[in-house]
Amino acid sequence: HMIALTDLAQLDEVVAADPQARFLVQTSVFPSWDWLAAHPDDQFRYADGSVETSIPLASVSSRQWRVDYGEQLRNLVRNILSHSNGDRVVGMLIGYMTSGEWFYWGTNERKYSDYSPVNVAAFRAWLAHKYSTDAALQAAWHEPSVTLPTAQIPTPAERDATHAFDLRDPSTSDQKTIDYYRFMADEIIDAQEHFREIVREETAGRWLTLHYFGYGYELSDYPFRANYGGHMAYARRSFGSPTLDMAAGPYSYYWRGPGQPGTSHTTQHSWALYNQLYWHEDDTRPTELPTLIQLARRNAARQL
């Protein structure tokens, strides 16, 4: 059973109905509004300086968020392990950002992020690691006045600029935007690794660790989603990661109806090459039984 855990009593309820139950528990690492009020520089921020008001969001680059909510995650794992049915838990899915699927909030609406002070500082640190010197950065960005301590996140206009269709040319000033998107993708995976390592440490590696992630197909339906989303480092960094057992995602929201193939968000079979699993979740909610049966048959056949 995949269960979005909000109360440990949920484990007991499922076991009462299914005495053989085993669980993948789903949790998230969203901060509280109070935490954001105490850490304003760590709050996820759009290009115009505004913050998200519909849900509390810390910058993925915030080290303080990683530390504080890593400890909350550690406490949750310990509580599960000490619960009477805790031995039935076999893994944990850790979610964050849009729908818990680790792509940046505002991606679907083309809202430019993350311009928070902590993200600017993290971007500069990433650039310093890549370029080492001001001269190397200036040459790559074709920007004679930029320095490692003063580099800024590209503006929305810079992020929209392309040279050939939707492609960017790394031999031009496009490199600034290329660097930023690589950085943003790296930060997501760095954060994921931080939280996974806590789970593996507390469970001595007994639990599977996974995320909704790796949407190489689904986030490529529009070029801006591929860039803004932050998933595109998964082939470079998630494949073969020793702390990532599985990735997950719903079936594609294209071609998922009766008689349609139910395609994947990700490069599904690539994960198997690295001895990793991919969990396909069907979040279709048909109202008619024949449709439900047809979709179940299609999904089962697709996995064979």
Task: List the predicted regions and their residue ranges.
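Short amphipathic alpha-helices and their capping/turn segments at secondary-structure boundaries
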Residues: 8-18, 77-84, 234-236, 264-272
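Polysaccharide-binding and catalytic clefts of secreted carbohydrate-active enzymes
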Residues: 42-240, 244-253
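Catalytic-core region of carbohydrate-active enzymes that cleave or remodel glycosidic bonds
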Residues: 193-209, 229-304
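Extracytoplasmic/secreted cell-surface and envelope-processing proteins
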Residues: 33-35, 102-103, 256-259
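A cross-family glycoside hydrolase active-site/sugar-binding cleft signature
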Residues: 1, 24-28, 93-95, 210-213, ...
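Amphipathic alpha-helical segments in well-structured domains
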Residues: 7-11, 73, 116, 120, ...
